[in-house]
Amino acid sequence: MANTWWEIQILCESALEDSVSWRLEDFGCRGTASESKGDSCLVKGYLPIFQAQLLDLAALGLWLQQDALCIGLSSPTLTWQLIDEEDWASSWKQYWHPQEIGDRFLINPAWLPSPENYDRLVIRLDPGVAFGTGNHATTQLCLESLEMRLSQVPKSFVSKDAGQEPVIIADIGCGSGILSIGAILLGAEKVYAVDTDPLAVQSTFSNRALNEVNPERLVPAEGSVDILKKLIERPVDGIVCNILADVIIQLVPEISEISKPSTWAIFSGILVEQSTSVVEALEKHGWVVATMWKRKEWCCLNVRRT
């Protein structure tokens, strides 16, 4: 018998879309999708039935109301229903379309044909239950930051003969693998991608194959920085970390251990109001913020060693 999932539907003002998506992910949803409805937005989230009871869903509704009130918007409408696994796995896909990000990327759903003669770097993606479709502001900010950091590296998928120093990157909280694949397409020599969610690691493996990335160049593994320490041969050149702010703060000491004086890092998953705490933790361990990019209520920190 198929597993049963909650399908949570939230109709909200468009300005609340990112906040609602973040709230659903924080609630434990394994996938989200959004659809424009005139001036409003319908956001859907999917959660295994055993992870939430009716009281939990009612509490989610209260949190969403509080989020809206805090920024002076009307309360969203929350509904839910039970669906079978095969239904949830495909229902959100109808709302996801090819999306250009930054100056160089196109995120193309795996179930759609790849565009021909396109002048952007195409990332084919089937996120499954993992976070990272390119729709969220934090993912976009990280990809745009990677463009900036790797702008000196040629477009060539193979960087060995490009006359550049090889760039080794760690992707902490890799989700669907979208940032790892983006880094490879921009010319990174190798990416070590870790996530504590085994389903996310599985998704990264699948998307690595979809994009025909050499397995030696993208190495996914289940775990966190402790696993990275075992995988890497030397400190990495770059770090990308798109996870919750509280987790970033906890990991900063360990992340610093896999860096060197020239290492740069990209941190997102951070609400603007949380940025001060994250910056303080980074500065305490020898990092300095070069730029902070904002999109709606989210921010992305581009940092380097002091």
Curated annotation (Swiss-Prot):
Q: Does the keyword Iron-sulfur apply?
A: no
Instruction: Please verify whether the record's keywords include Nucleotide-binding.
Output: no
Gene Ontology biological process terms from the UniProt entry = methylation
Entry GO CC: cytoplasm
User: Taxonomically, which superkingdom?
Assistant: Bacteria
Q: Which UniProt keywords apply?
A: Cytoplasm, Methyltransferase, S-adenosyl-L-methionine, Transferase
Substrates-to-products reaction catalysed: L-lysyl-[protein] + 3 S-adenosyl-L-methionine = N(6),N(6),N(6)-trimethyl-L-lysyl-[protein] + 3 S-adenosyl-L-homocysteine + 3 H(+)
MF (Gene Ontology): protein-lysine N-methyltransferase activity
Pfam families in UniProt: PrmA (PF06325)
Per UniProt, S-adenosyl-L-methionine binds at T139, G173, D195, N242
Question: What SUPFAM superfamilies is this protein classified in?
Answer: S-adenosyl-L-methionine-dependent methyltransferases
Q: What is its EC number?
A: 2.1.1.-
Q: What is its main location?
A: cytoplasm
Q: Which family does it belong to?
A: Belongs to the methyltransferase superfamily. PrmA family.
Give the protein name, as stated in the record. Ribosomal protein L11 methyltransferase
Q: Which organism is it from?
A: Trichormus variabilis (strain ATCC 29413 / PCC 7937) (Anabaena variabilis)
Q: Could you read off the lineage of the organism from its UniProt record?
A: Bacteria, Bacillati, Cyanobacteriota, Cyanophyceae, Nostocales
What gene is behind this protein?
prmA
